[in-house]
Amino acid sequence: KVAFRAKPSQFAFAIGNSVTVSNIVVTLSTTASSADFNSPNYISNTFANNVGADVTTVYSGPITFTTSGTVNTTAFEYVINLSTPFLYSKGAGNLLLDITTPDGSTTSGPGSVGYAPVDYASDSPSSPDGAAIAFNGATSASPIGSNSVASVITQFTTTPAPEPATLSMAGVGLVALVARRRRKTA
């Protein structure tokens, strides 16, 4: 799952407690783009330039974001439960999270959708291990937006993938168990 921290309640005029979006598309990929402002691979404001070859749609559909609106919250209350797994290897590049609200999507509820209701931090000065964003409030007809070292505070909940050696050992153990059982019954 992916979760975001809501802004504290002093920003309630921009947030509200709940907002529903009729359709979002969430993709994950690895990317050569960097969060380091001084890097020649700094995240591009041309969105397609950031997406890796292993791009995977991990969620698509309606979603409701709800917050308790408590003062100075540090809880990650805006949650997207992913429907498709993504295997990330740091050696393949940086992790790119891309959230798109397709043209024609609607919102309802007292809150707003976009950059305003989520808490963010600035990675200034930028660093290779930091975070960066590219964003666009316009339509899909505008594939170029803005980029920044300010980034949404995001929590990724992960499940480690079993190592190939672990799977092999489990297979060897299973074969040995079956062989032992056959000897006892013979």
Residue ranges and their predicted role:
Residues 1-9, 97:
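A short beta-strand element within beta-rich, extracytoplasmic domains
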Residues 10-13, 35-36:
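Short active-site-adjacent helix-start/loop capping segments
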Residues 13-19:
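Short consensus segments that form the blades of beta-propeller domains
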Residues 19, 27-122:
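Aromatic- and Gly/Pro-enriched, solvent-exposed loop/edge beta-strand patches characteristic
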Residues 24, 78, 152-154:
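Hydrophobic residues positioned within well-ordered beta-strands of beta-sheet architectures
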Residues 91-160:
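Proprotein-processing/basic-patch segments
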Residues 162-180:
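A short, hydrophobic C-terminal helix/tail in secreted or cell-surface proteins
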Residues 183-186:
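Short, charged juxtamembrane terminal tails flanking transmembrane helices
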